[in-house]
């Protein structure tokens, strides 16, 4: 019996599933739109929406929680500085899923998962800028030592 069992297994172990969700959420935060299978998109949406809700708090505890979940400080920085202020007035519903037909090889249902109210022209430029800033700070720290 499946009583009180929530979520999808997606034919993965728990650690594999959590790693996949973390990697997909970093990609979604970076590009603000990704193409994946429909079951993965349906599983990813509540994961990322909870991250945005935590990022809206904006304190140190929230930052540490986000780093523990997605393990990418640059993505956490974009969550805290760009996405949290963008959705400050919105209470949930930060992400939409658009069905995108079927994949040729195995006819798996595909979907686009994207942020609502996203800037279509940016295409990950903010993420690259944050990444370059982090890289420059690291180089400066190495040169000072």
From Swiss-Prot:
Task: Please describe the quaternary structure of this protein.
Answer: Part of the 50S ribosomal subunit. Contacts protein L32.
- Would the keyword Ribonucleoprotein turn up in this protein's UniProt record? yes
Which terms under GO biological process does the entry name? translation
The record's GO molecular-function terms, alphabetically, read: structural constituent of ribosome
- The answer to whether the entry has keyword Ribonucleoprotein is yes
Q: PROSITE patterns from the entry?
A: RIBOSOMAL_L17 (PS01167)
GO CC terms in record? cytosolic large ribosomal subunit
Full protein name: Large ribosomal subunit protein bL17
Query: One Pfam family, short name please?
Result: Ribosomal_L17
Instruction: Please report which protein family the annotation says this sequence is part of.
Output: Belongs to the bacterial ribosomal protein bL17 family.
- Protein origin, superkingdom: Bacteria
């Amino acid at each position: 019996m499946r009583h009180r069992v929530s979520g999808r297994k997606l034919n993965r172990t728990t650690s594999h599933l959590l790693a996949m969700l973390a990697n997909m959420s970093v990609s979604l935060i970076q590009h603000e739109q990704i193409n994946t299978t429909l079951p993965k998109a349906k599983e990813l949406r509540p994961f990322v929406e909870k991250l945005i809700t935590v990022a809206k708090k904006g304190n140190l505890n929230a930052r540490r929680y986000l780093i523990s979940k997605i393990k990418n400080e640059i993505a956490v920085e974009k969550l805290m500085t760009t996405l949290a202020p963008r959705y400050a007035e919105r209470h949930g519903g930060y992400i939409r899923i658009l069905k995108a037909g079927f994949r040729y090889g195995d006819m798996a249902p595909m979907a686009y998962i994207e942020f609502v109210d996203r800037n279509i022209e940016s295409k990950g430029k903010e993420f690259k800028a944050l990444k370059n800033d982090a890289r420059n700070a690291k180089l400066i720290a190495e040169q000072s030592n």
